[in-house]
């Protein structure tokens, strides 16, 4: 299967380099504009793979009129992709590689199980996965309907409870004002996603953030944009780099 295009904002991650040159794989980038459909049509794809964002009544008919279109949707609607197992199975089916998809799922499960054995965490240890999406707001995933938290749960971590005063919880996420950052201290491990720009750097300069027990006790890990994207939507390709990054962090919890 030869990919011909990807969204303009698609963060492919260094793990794709192991397969091929990303510039050769993604020869076109699609902007989310009124001309996107025409751009896709000129590429004459045999298959269109989209997130749940293209599954609405307006976008889906426009794309499926060009080529067969498959989308992924989390059961809770909390992420733009379903579980990585579901995604892998579906892609294996539509490309005629179902057996290989099953093998990949089994291999990835084995890698996760090995990581959990190599980096055991204390019973009851909890995690939160958060990111500063706006100048005045941090958003944290709060249940394991989120694909990334399901992966972290498989490593033995529970999901920290951030509900209560100071957190607006909806759609599987908690919106925290900067004044309520101390809610992050409910987690034994805080994983912060850096979504680019100066938002994370500015957050780290603020006294309230610096005063968090998790920060002072070195229980915070900040992921770059590629790994943040990976944890938001884990796949068999990006799970090994996530394990490599998070393994030493899990070891610190057990120390």
What spans do the regions from the language model cover?
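Hydrophobic beta-strand scaffold residues
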Residues: 3, 69-70, 159
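Extracytoplasmic ligand-binding site segments that recognize negatively charged/polar headgroups
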Residues: 11-14, 56-58, 73-90, 124-150, ...
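Alpha-helical, coiled-coil/dimerization segments enriched in small aliphatic residues
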Residues: 10, 141-173, 227
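Structured C-terminal subdomain patch of bacterial secreted/periplasmic proteins
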Residues: 184-255
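Proline-aspartate-enriched helix->loop->beta-strand connector
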Residues: 40-50, 68, 181, 186-190
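Extracytoplasmic substrate-binding proteins
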Residues: 65-135, 232-255
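A short, structured surface patch at a secondary-structure boundary
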Residues: 1-41, 48, 52
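Ligand-binding pocket segment of bilobal, Venus flytrap-like solute-binding proteins
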Residues: 118-119, 123, 132-135, 139, ...
């Amino acid at each position: 299967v030869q990919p011909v295009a990807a969204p303009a904002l698609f963060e492919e991650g260094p793990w794709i380099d192991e397969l091929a040159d990303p510039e050769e794989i993604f020869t076109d980038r699609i902007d989310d504009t009124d001309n996107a459909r025409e751009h896709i049509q000129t590429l004459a794809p045999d298959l269109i793979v989209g997130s749940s964002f293209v599954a609405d009544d307006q976008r889906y008919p426009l794309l499926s009129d060009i080529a067969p279109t498959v989308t992924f949707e989390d059961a809770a609607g909390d992420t733009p992709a379903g579980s990585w197992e579901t995604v892998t199975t579906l892609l294996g089916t539509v490309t005629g590689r179902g057996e290989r998809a099953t093998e990949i799922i089994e291999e990835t499960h084995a890698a996760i199980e090995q990581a959990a054995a190599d980096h055991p965490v204390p019973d009851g240890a909890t995690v939160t996965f958060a990111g500063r999406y706006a100048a005045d707001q941090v958003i944290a995933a709060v249940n394991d309907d989120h694909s990334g938290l399901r992966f972290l749960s498989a490593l033995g971590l529970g999901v920290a409870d951030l509900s209560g005063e100071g957190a607006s919880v909806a759609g599987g996420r908690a919106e925290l004002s900067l004044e309520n950052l101390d809610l992050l201290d409910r987690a034994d491990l805080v994983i912060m996603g850096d979504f680019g720009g100066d938002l994370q750097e500015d957050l780290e300069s603020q006294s309230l953030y610096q005063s968090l027990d998790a920060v002072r006790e070195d229980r915070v890990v900040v992921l770059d944009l590629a790994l943040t994207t990976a944890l938001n939507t884990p796949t068999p390709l990006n799970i090994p780099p996530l394990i490599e990054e998070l393994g030493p962090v899990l070891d610190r919890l057990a120390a």
